[in-house]
């Protein structure tokens, strides 16, 4: 009975995983926007912001007379680094393009670089400043006297945009660095006349970051509240708007692999507003009232991230931005697995081979447990004649039959569930690797065998995507059948039927799984078959 329950538990664990993915795709949880007839006020537009208190970096000392402001004609400003190419508009520093040099939209030759900004999101400003709830890039006049930036390794540069918005002189200083995707902003505010109090907000926005993500990758709004990661994926929820208050570290729009985030330096009294509208995902981190003394100046700062969810770089970012890489409940397993994959990849240069090496290591770790389990199955095989007699003798009295069976197991020191232990132990590793493959930017477009042998057909060129020809899941199912042939058949007819259908169920489940995960399970099956064969020969 215990063995039967354990096997059913294993099957249910995998069914839950697939069922969740199915529901996410078919019940409107996929982050795809529904069309809207008209464009209304977006949630990040601050007309609904409640007044809040906030500490400011104020400099009340008198300063020189404000120079005459001369608006300039709008033009494009370009920032080029080894990591990206950014194009901004001088009218308020609106971001028009942010192309990632090292990441392509597809694995095909000539595919364009991933652009974190699209035309629709440019209208709503993916790198904007809200003043009194209004978009400063639309309501003010701006000037820019600088030039383009071209940054080499280790270099940084500053673009300064000056404007007059709602009676306030606004100076936006954006600092770009060649070695990170972090953009740092300092906003200097000075009243044109008397002391002023304004409400300030930092906004980021983008289009769909996962156009080809399918049911496993959705664009969503996420945030870190009091050190705890939260997100909303449902398109219907995002269209209604998201409002969060409290100890917020950052707000973001993200997919499995890419991140657009705003992280105010001073998070006191910050409110997050998020919304999906007209195909644009937008987040605003809005502050409370900012006091600007007459003749003085107030400085407020914010950091932005436009780029991949690169663990190494995000670890160096402020406001715990590294928590944007959320690996779920199995993160304690997934993170070491990613580290091991990186270690192997550093030496072999192929993530498919790295997964195979990782599988071998995991198999060696679990070898003693597997060995004990297979011995238990062999003992169960020897007990089958006695178990069959008990069934015939107590067939009408299941309670008595189970009692006699347990006495028999105890006499021969056999654990009826022992044969299931290797699979049960591997389930956390399976889910950990599943999360790692879905969320590790290192594995996006990572190849194993790029073409089918002796053909030009692209095959396992992206281990984070499914096998396009379903070869690996079918072979994996065949190895499960072979493994069953080497395993003693369960005495319970119901249990035997469940085991018979397991390879079929697993094969269909794995058809849409990332091919890297299928390679792991296939390799694990082959090693298990080799171990069983070795034990049978030894016996």
From Swiss-Prot:
CDD domains the record matches: 5TM_YidC_Alb3 (cd20070), EcYidC-like_peri (cd19961)
Disordered: region residues: 32-64
Membrane topology: Multi-pass membrane protein
Assembly behavior: Interacts with the Sec translocase complex via SecD. Specifically interacts with transmembrane segments of nascent integral membrane proteins during membrane integration.
Function: Required for the insertion and/or proper folding and/or complex formation of integral membrane proteins into the membrane. Involved in integration of membrane proteins that insert both dependently and independently of the Sec translocase complex, as well as at least some lipoproteins. Aids folding of multispanning membrane proteins.
Family statement: Belongs to the OXA1/ALB3/YidC family. Type 1 subfamily.
Name of the molecule in the record: Membrane protein insertase YidC
């Amino acid at each position: 009975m215990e063995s039967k329950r354990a096997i059913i538990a294993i099957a249910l664990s995998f069914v839950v995983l697939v069922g969740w993915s199915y529901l996410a795709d078919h019940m409107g949880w996929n982050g795809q926007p529904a069309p809207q007839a008209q464009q209304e006020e977006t949630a990040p537009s601050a007309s609904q912001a409640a007044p809040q208190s906030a500490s400011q970096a104020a400099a009340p000392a008198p300063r020189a007379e404000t120079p005459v402001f001369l608006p300039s004609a709008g033009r494009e400003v370009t920032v080029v680094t080894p990591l990206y190419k950014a194009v901004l508009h001088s009218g308020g520093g609106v971001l028009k393009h942010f192309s990632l040099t090292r990441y392509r939209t597809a694995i095909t030759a000539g595919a364009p670089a991933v652009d974190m900004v699209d035309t629709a999101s440019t209208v709503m400003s993916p790198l904007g400043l809200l003043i009194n709830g209004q978009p400063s890039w639309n309501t003010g006049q701006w000037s820019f006297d600088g030039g383009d930036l071209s940054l080499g390794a280790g270099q940084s540069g500053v673009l300064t945009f000056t404007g007059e918005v709602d009676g306030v002189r606004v100076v936006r200083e954006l600092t770009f660095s060649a070695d990170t995707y972090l953009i740092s902003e300092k906003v200097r505010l000075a009243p044109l006349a008397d002391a002023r109090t304004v409400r300030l907000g930092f906004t980021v926005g983008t289009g769909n970051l996962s156009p080809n993500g399918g049911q496993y990758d959705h664009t969503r709004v996420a945030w870190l509240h009091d050190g705890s990661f939260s997100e909303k994926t449902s398109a219907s929820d995002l269209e209604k708007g998201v409002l969060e208050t409290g100890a917020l570290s950052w707000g973001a729009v993200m997919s499995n692999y890419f991140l657009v985030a705003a992280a105010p330096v001073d998070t006191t009294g910050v409110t997050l507003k998020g919304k999906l509208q007209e195909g644009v995902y937008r987040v605003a981190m809005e502050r409370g009232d900012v006091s600007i003394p007459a003749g003085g100046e107030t400085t407020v700062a914010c950091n932005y991230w436009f780029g991949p969810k690169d663990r190494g770089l995000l670890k160096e970012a402020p406001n715990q931005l590294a928590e944007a890489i959320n690996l779920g409940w199995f993160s304690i397993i997934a993170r070491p697995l990613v580290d091991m994959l990186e270690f192997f990849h550093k030496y072999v240069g192929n993530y498919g081979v790295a997964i195979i090496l990782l599988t071998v290591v995991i198999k060696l770790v679990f070898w003693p447990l597997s060995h004990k389990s297979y011995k238990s199955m062999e003992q169960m095989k020897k007990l089958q004649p006695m178990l069959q007699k008990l069934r015939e003798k107590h067939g009408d009295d299941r309670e008595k039959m189970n009692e006699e069976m347990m006495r028999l197991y105890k006499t021969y020191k056999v654990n009826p569930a022992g044969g299931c232990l290797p699979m049960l132990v591997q389930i956390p590793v399976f889910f950990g690797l599943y999360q790692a493959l879905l969320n590790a930017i290192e594995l996006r477009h990572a190849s194993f065998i790029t073409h089918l042998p002796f053909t030009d057909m692209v095959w396992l060129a992206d281990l984070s995507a499914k096998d396009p020809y379903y070869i690996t899941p079918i072979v994996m199912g065949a190895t499960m059948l072979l493994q069953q042939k080497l395993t003693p058949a369960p005495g319970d007819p119901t249990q035997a039927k469940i085991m018979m259908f397991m390879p079929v169920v697993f094969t269909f489940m794995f058809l849409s799984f990332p091919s890297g995960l299928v390679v792991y399970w296939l390799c694990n099956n082959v090693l298990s078959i080799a171990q069983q064969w070795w034990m049978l020969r030894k016996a």
